[in-house]
Amino acid sequence: MSQFLPVTKKDMEDRGWDQVDFVYVTGDAYVDHSSFGTAIISRLLESRGYKVGIIPQPDWRRKESIAVFGEPRLGFLVSAGNMDSMVNHYTVAKKHRQKDSYSPGGKMGLRPDRAVIVYSNLIRQTFKKTPVILGGIEASLRRMAHYDYWENKVKHSILIDSGADLISYGMGEHSIIEIAEALDSGIPVSEITYVAGTVYKCRDLSRTYEPIILPSFDEVQADKQAYARSFAIQYQNTDPFTAGTMAEFYGTKGYVIQNPPALPLTQEEMDDVYDLPYVGNYHPMYEKDGGIPALEEIKFSLTSNRGCFGSCSFCALTFHQGRILQTRSHESILKEAVHMTEEKDFKGYIHDVGGPTADFRQPSCQKQLTRGVCKNRHCLFPEPCKNLTADHKDYVSLLRKLRDLPKVKKVFVRSGVRFDYVLADPDKTFLNELAKYHVSGQLRVAPEHVSNQVLKYMGKPSHEVYEKFLKEFDKANKKAGLQQFAVPYFMSSHPGCTMKEAVKLAEYVRDLGFTPEQVQDFYPTPSTLSTCMYYTGIHPLTGEEVYVPKSAHEKAIQRALMQYKNPVNRELVLEGLKIAGRMDLVGYGEKCLIRPVRKGHGDSKYTENAGRNRESKHSPAPKKTIRNHHTRKKQK
């Protein structure tokens, strides 16, 4: 049986070790599961003979907390965890979240804001010369100068502010092994400048071969046009086969150099990574706190792929995992599934089989495997490329094998299917079997919007494509003798979304006959195409000016429009309708979103506090004919 890696000096000594080779400092609790980057990288290093100790969620107010194992022989590895620490801590409205799913019992406050910078500087206070290598999503997406939504300014590469030596960006397996081997052979960390998938600092470019010179930090900080140009160059250099080395100048601090991305893992390498001896659970020290909430959903889920060629503008996957699909073999996935069914708390349900996009099981075309993805076009947007290979046969076969396993009652597909890719496949077997076997009443899909203008900036297919998918899904349900529904995810206030487009989305929600309980407001996270548009007002790939709903108030209005039935949103909805010139939607008709203010009740305070006033003995009972309520329409 696998045992957890050391988290204390006693754990280290119990193994007979005097010193660890690497100390992995993470902002997450320690969960030894393949869905956690800390587990993957530390287990991979262990498999190559390196001794790794884990310091999960150290107290950043005490420098002693970073010295649990003393000085490591080779270096410190630092990650904020599975999520960016700022996204983990704050909503898009910049309000503190109440729960941290990656901490014991969901407790908030066990990691600092900007965890990578804080941890790295904490290490430097005690271990001034020990190599520090950054990794994980927070460091990866801040590897060059970037717009920071929380401070509303352009910030340095995280390498500058952290005082670290290297960034291992992306998924990191190839680069971390190469870094470890270099350090182990005695190469100084300052000379490890050749590893693909890394970022390093240097004083000049004398040892950098034909770099692409990006606009300097001072330029991108001062000029939004320069920022957009820089982003476009970086966006077009995310493929390991075609990317160049990029250099960004920081004045007296020298240069930050980004090497091309590491090659994607082969299927054999993917299998090896997921076959490492993970315990599959959180460390027992968290038992008293109720465990780690993030594990609950993924404990009985299976990762089948990495990478995504969907290229949604608001998604960071292009910068982090890349566009080239990497998959595990059926044998590897089935082996994990069988092991899963033997867990004492397995109830017969596999919660998900997928990855960034569940139904991607092969590269979009064969060219990707040898020449990389196209720099000047996308695989699915604005419509599927003529060279796209849309084929679900392998995924269908995998799902069938999983369904046939003993002890398995049902296999769900919850990580999302790309509906335009489903439609591009002329064989309807997958859609038919998805409806029949892998959905439980509702299929969650992500059209994101209904306005083709907004969808263009999102990098999503037109609304007509989504409507066609709904018809095909309905046919598949009828064929299976089931009544199931597609539940759409929508996003408000994305760049390009004017108030008129927001009202159009509200009308669509009205016609669906349901009110979304949760609305995803666009969140400008580092290194996405949409965030570049948000900050600059420019589409970096076309130079086109883009309307951006930026103020907190306008974002609140667009969000409220999607939940127009909620009485507390009435004033915001009314304001949005006025701005859009759509006062025809205020009235008593079935197409209206809100009712007019009642005569005799003064100003809008009555409606803002409608619920309270109805209960007041001083208020007359409301007439049924003018309730701020819409009858839920029956699903067709």
Predicted stretch roles:
Residues 24, 55, 59-60, 339-487, ...:
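Conserved SAM/AdoMet-binding glycine-rich loop
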Residues 25-28, 289-316, 341, 349:
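N-terminal pre-triad scaffold of radical SAM enzymes
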Residues 37, 56-251, 258-259:
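Glycine-rich beta-alpha loop elements in corrinoid/cobalamin-binding modules
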Residues 61, 190-238, 262-265, 292, ...:
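Terminal amphipathic helices with adjacent charged low-complexity linkers/tails
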Residues 84-93, 141-143, 173-178, 203-206, ...:
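Flexible glycine/acidic-rich beta-alpha junction loops that bind and position SAM and/or redox cofactors
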Residues 158-170, 560-604:
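Amphipathic alpha-helical packing elements
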Residues 165, 273, 308, 333, ...:
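Conserved, mostly hydrophobic/aromatic
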Residues 371, 377, 593-636:
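Acidic, low-complexity intrinsically disordered tails
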